[in-house]
C-alpha cells in the first residue's frame, strides 16, 4: 500500500479500456462486401468447419465475420451487414454477419429463435 507522498509523486494510473470492436466505430451495424468466403477450424478442444467471410467494410476496414446458422448463400462480392460479437473458439473473428439482410438469406426451416437467423414465420 503506497503512502500519501508516494501517491502525490506518482498518482494511480487508470486501466486502459480496449475497444473490442474497433471497426464498428461506435455504430450498431456496418455494411461491407465479402472478399473471401471460406471455412476454418476452431481451437481445441472443439472440432468443426466454421463458415466465415473476409469483409471489406464501407469505412475501409477489413474484418472477418462469422456466418451463423446452417447453410448460406454468400459468395465473393456479396453485400452483407455485420454486427459486433466474437466467436470464442475462432481466433480473430470479432464480428457476426446478420442473416436475412441485404444479400444474406435467412436460414430456411428455422422454427425457434427465428429473428436471430432472419427466418420468416412458417405458415
Swiss-Prot record:
One Pfam family here: Ribosom_S12_S23
UniProt keyword list: Methylation, Ribonucleoprotein, Ribosomal protein, RNA-binding, rRNA-binding, tRNA-binding
GO molecular function, one term: structural constituent of ribosome
Chain positions with 3-methylthioaspartic acid modification: 89
Record InterPro entries: NA-bd_OB-fold, Ribosomal_uS12, Ribosomal_uS12_bac
GO cellular component, one term: small ribosomal subunit
Single GO biological process annotation from the record: translation
PANTHER family assigned to the protein according to its UniProt record, in alphabetical order: 30S RIBOSOMAL PROTEIN S12 FAMILY MEMBER
Subunit architecture: Part of the 30S ribosomal subunit. Contacts proteins S8 and S17. May interact with IF1 in the 30S initiation complex.
NCBIfam families associated with the record: rpsL_bact
Protein function: With S4 and S5 plays an important role in translational accuracy. Interacts with and stabilizes bases of the 16S rRNA that are involved in tRNA selection in the A site and with the mRNA backbone. Located at the interface of the 30S and 50S subunits, it traverses the body of the 30S subunit contacting proteins on the other side and probably holding the rRNA structure together. The combined cluster of proteins S8, S12 and S17 appears to hold together the shoulder and platform of the 30S subunit.
HAMAP family membership: Ribosomal_uS12_B
Similarity comment: Belongs to the universal ribosomal protein uS12 family.
Protein name as catalogued: Small ribosomal subunit protein uS12
Organism (species): Chelativorans sp. (strain BNC1)
